[in-house]
Amino acid sequence: MKKILALLVIAPLLVSCSGNKNQVENEVFVKDTNGFEILMGQFAHNIENIWGLKEVLIAGPKDYVKYTDQYQTRSHINFDAGTITIETIATTNPAAHLRQAIITTLLMGDDPGSIDLYSDVNDIQISKEPFLYGQVLDNNGEPIRWEWRAAHFADYLLQNKMQTRTSGLHVISFVTIQLVPNHLDKRAHKYLPLVRKSAARYGVEESLILAIMQTESSFNPYAVSRSDALGLMQVVQHTAGKDVFKLKGKSGQPSRSYLFDPENNIDAGTAYLSILQNTYLGGIQNATSRRYAVITSYNGGAGSVLRVFHSDKNKAVGIINTMSPGDVFQTLTTKHPSGESRRYLVKVNSAQKNYRRY
């Protein structure tokens, strides 16, 4: 019971990080990134106390994780791997716990503001247009929109696919559901109208926006990170968010609930790309070289990109303008001080090629 109480104390402070629009008062506390990281560490520690060593799962950029039943049951969607795992450590009638979690996960909507990822409250609203509609097929090969179909599929899974595994002192009951092979493409198409709207507004390539979204979140609207980046394009409130609000003539920075709205998030992420493209890196003459710099800057900042070439920003731009795009790419992917940023350029550039066909 003490383990549950510890989570009940921490969870309300993390509520605003999940985008819950009813908990705006908590945002002041978690605006400090260090405070957020401390709370996340405490949350992880308490999950470990309940589930055991090596069993900590927390929502991330490409992972939706929701706990229910006093943190004894959880739903995990791995958007990269294309799998849904519903599991429970409940010892009394585990199938019943799994059944409810399967149904609500299959039928949840795509509004992150309606779900608190850090509490154990089953606050998932069944949607008439489920977020996973078309991404999961039942045992008859049919997409799942209605509660009766989700319930039938849950019963089928529990009768035919339920498994158990042992972890520490727990026997964990679970089922695994595969997303359809083209699940990534289906999510991309879902947000295409919003992408096109923002691309036209800010003069940014649609394919670049989609590639950034894939790399940042795998089109997961519930995306969160320990670095305090939020939503589909993983916008950070106090850096990119501030720049975007300044561009719009607004003071301050966007709230978490604002950035968890898919339309706002895509708008903000695209606006920031336009700031990088037209302001911070606007002096780079070759469009391809500038695109490489913009992509890397979206991950690690424009200053760190320019310092790869020279400590003086103006001289750095001048040096870039004497180089071929291939040499710029080679330099950024081998000499940027951040390994993450080096890999990021490779990933986004590769993904963008696939989205040029849209």
Curated annotation (Swiss-Prot):
InterPro entries, sorted: Lysozyme-like_dom_sf (IPR023346), Murein_transglycosylaseC (IPR023664), Murein_transglycosylaseC_N (IPR024570), Transglyc_AS (IPR000189), Transglycosylase_SLT_dom_1 (IPR008258)
Keywords: Cell outer membrane, Cell wall biogenesis/degradation, Lipoprotein, Lyase, Membrane, Palmitate, Signal
Membrane topology label: Lipid-anchor
Residues with a covalently attached lipid (S-diacylglycerol cysteine): 17
EC class of the enzyme, as a word: lyase
PROSITE patterns, per the entry: PROKAR_LIPOPROTEIN (PS51257), TRANSGLYCOSYLASE (PS00922)
Localization (cell): Cell outer membrane
EC numbers on record: 4.2.2.n1
GO biological process per UniProt: cell wall macromolecule catabolic process; cell wall organization; peptidoglycan metabolic process
Lipidation (N-palmitoyl cysteine): 17
Keyword Membrane: yes
Catalyzed reaction equations: Exolytic cleavage of the (1->4)-beta-glycosidic linkage between N-acetylmuramic acid (MurNAc) and N-acetylglucosamine (GlcNAc) residues in peptidoglycan, from either the reducing or the non-reducing ends of the peptidoglycan chains, with concomitant formation of a 1,6-anhydrobond in the MurNAc residue
Role, per record: Murein-degrading enzyme. May play a role in recycling of muropeptides during cell elongation and/or cell division.
The family this protein is said to belong to: Belongs to the transglycosylase Slt family.
Protein's name according to its UniProt entry: Membrane-bound lytic murein transglycosylase C
Organism: Yersinia pestis
